[in-house]
């Protein structure tokens, strides 16, 4: 005789003993589950399905409660594939939201949305865990002082400075140096600020995630020999994952970053690649839960979901989380609800230009398209602001003159315009910089340039004091003194060739 799988002995239900429910309905990644009266789980509680499928293979699926339907039924979204699940299977209510490991033991490791390591390096050596659903810091805890987050990268610090505890949008196509810029920022925050980084791969390609991991190992950001000395923790929810995982993986990464800020009192850099995929996953889940779609088919709760994530990324009196978010703009339409909602939260934008990358100028940050709310005299000071504005004016004038140069040549320009072009070309090259993480590829030692040194360098170029130096002297150097030294070396080399 076949026994009911939900009872352990006649007349006594294990559902009532263990506070477990039964699967009623499965539609893709969405499960409807019935619980005993009075034993309903709370919204966002984690539910676990542990069983065996028809091939006697172990099933272990974690779900998150999204809706209470009435009649003791809840609707949950699975965080992994629902293959092999059947009606009638037992579902255990954990009584708490999804919790993930936090702390120093997470550095150098790769996790999935559930906080399980997926790098084949064994379990994580930590007992500390945090729930992924947490409140944003209270107003009284926030640090209201506006301060610049120095990155040591000249073009960023001068023209589009980052705010400590701010949010930065990183716009760039494939092959313009986005990954290298991300790795350099991770490296510099570790060295200059004693901080750590968390990278959240939200709905990205598995190949790109793997490439990033390999490049981090190669450049030393992840230390294979001594994993505790690594500077970054990685959390991945790839494109092939169910929408529930892609929707929550950003929160998993953010939770790990919050521990470093609140408990270790550190400055943390949080990378989210790509924030659009977070919105996209939320849209899929919303449709699966039967909600009426809003504009352009997005979820009606788009602003709420984005706000609940972004409001947790902030500076407190203990430390800061500075977030750099790659933003995909669908069909290059900036009015699309997903990027438009993201822009409302950003303090700065860093735009990577294919034109600059093709000239070999790295980092290929576009000095005219990149913006920052921090570039104001009352925040950065008059000297910084005026230098940045003069640099932008010179580059803008050069851009306007390029058509004339292409048709008539440099000789047809006025003396003043020729001087502007010469200085703009020097500025363009001086905005390039050798990176620490690219040392293994270029052979040039990396350079960290402080903000004061950066301002001094550009002031000297704008004042005309360095008009006699060749353009090549400004290419891939750190501070302005290195450009002068390089000019002397170039002169000596040319004499030797003669």
From Swiss-Prot:
GO terms (BP aspect): proton motive force-driven mitochondrial ATP synthesis
UniProt keyword Chloroplast, yes or no: yes
Compartments where located: Plastid, Chloroplast thylakoid membrane
E.C. code: 7.1.2.2
Binding-site residues for ATP, renumbered to this chain: 172-179
Gene Ontology molecular function: any one: ATP hydrolysis activity
Signal sequence residues: none
Membrane topology: Peripheral membrane protein
GO cellular component: chloroplast thylakoid membrane; mitochondrion; proton-transporting ATP synthase complex
Main localization, broad class: plastid
Alphabetized HAMAP family for the sequence: ATP_synth_beta_bact
Subunit structure and binding partners: F-type ATPases have 2 components, CF(1) - the catalytic core - and CF(0) - the membrane proton channel. CF(1) has five subunits: alpha(3), beta(3), gamma(1), delta(1), epsilon(1). CF(0) has four main subunits: a(1), b(1), b'(1) and c(9-12).
UniProt name for this protein: ATP synthase subunit beta, chloroplastic
Gene (UniProt): atpB
């Amino acid at each position: 005789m076949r026994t009911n799988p939900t009872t352990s002995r006649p007349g006594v239900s294990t559902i009532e003993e263990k506070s477990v429910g039964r699967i009623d309905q499965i539609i893709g990644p969405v499960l409807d589950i019935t619980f005993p009266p009075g034993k309903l789980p709370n919204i966002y509680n984690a539910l676990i399905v542990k069983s065996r499928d028809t091939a006697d293979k172990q099933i272990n699926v974690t779900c998150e409660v999204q809706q209470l339907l009435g009649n003791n039924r809840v609707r949950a979204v699975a965080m992994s594939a629902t293959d092999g699940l059947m009606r009638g299977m037992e579902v255990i209510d954990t009584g708490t939201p999804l919790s993930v490991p936090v702390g120093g033991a997470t550095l150098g490791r790769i996790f999935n949305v559930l906080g399980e390591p997926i790098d084949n390096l064994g379990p994580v050596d930590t007992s500390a865990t945090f729930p992924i659903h947490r409140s944003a810091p209270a107003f009284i805890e926030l640090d209201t002082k506006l301060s610049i987050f120095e990155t040591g990268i000249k073009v960023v610090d001068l023209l589009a400075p980052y705010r400590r505890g701010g949010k930065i949008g990183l716009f760039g196509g494939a092959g313009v140096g986005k990954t290298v810029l991300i790795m350099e920022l991770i490296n510099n925050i570790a060295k200059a600020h004693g901080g750590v980084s968390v990278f959240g791969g939200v709905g990205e390609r598995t190949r790109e995630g793997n490439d990033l991991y390999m490049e981090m190992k190669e450049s030393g950001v992840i230390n294979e020999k001594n994993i505790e000395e690594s500077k970054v923790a990685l959390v991945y929810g790839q494109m092939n994952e169910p929408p529930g995982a892609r929707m929550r993986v950003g929160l998993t990464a953010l939770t790990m970053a919050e521990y470093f800020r609140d408990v270790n009192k550190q400055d943390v850099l949080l990378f989210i690649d790509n924030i659009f995929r977070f919105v996209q996953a939320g849209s899929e889940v919303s449709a699966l839960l039967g909600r009426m779609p809003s504009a352009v088919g997005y979820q009606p709760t788009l602003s709420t979901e984005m706000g609940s994530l972004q409001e947790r990324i902030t500076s407190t009196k203990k430390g800061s989380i500075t977030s750099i978010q790659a933003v995909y703009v669908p069909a290059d339409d900036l009015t699309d609800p997903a990027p438009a909602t993201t822009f409302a939260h950003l303090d700065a934008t860093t735009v990577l230009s294919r034109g600059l990358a093709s000239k070999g100028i790295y980092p290929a940050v576009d000095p005219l398209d990149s913006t920052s709310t921090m570039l104001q005299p009352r925040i950065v000071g008059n000297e910084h602001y005026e230098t940045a504005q003069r640099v932008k004016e010179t580059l803008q004038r050069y851009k306007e003159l390029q058509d004339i140069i292409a048709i008539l040549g440099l000789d047809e320009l006025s003396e003043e315009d020729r001087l502007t072009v010469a200085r703009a070309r020097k500025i363009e090259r001086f905005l390039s910089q050798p990176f620490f993480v690219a040392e293994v590829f270029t052979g040039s030692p990396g350079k960290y340039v402080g903000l004061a040194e950066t301002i001094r360098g550009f002031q000297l170029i704008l004042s005309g004091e360095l008009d006699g130096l060749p353009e090549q002297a400004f290419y891939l150097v750190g501070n302005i003194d290195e450009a002068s030294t390089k000019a002397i070396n170039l002169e000596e080399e040319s004499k030797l060739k003669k």
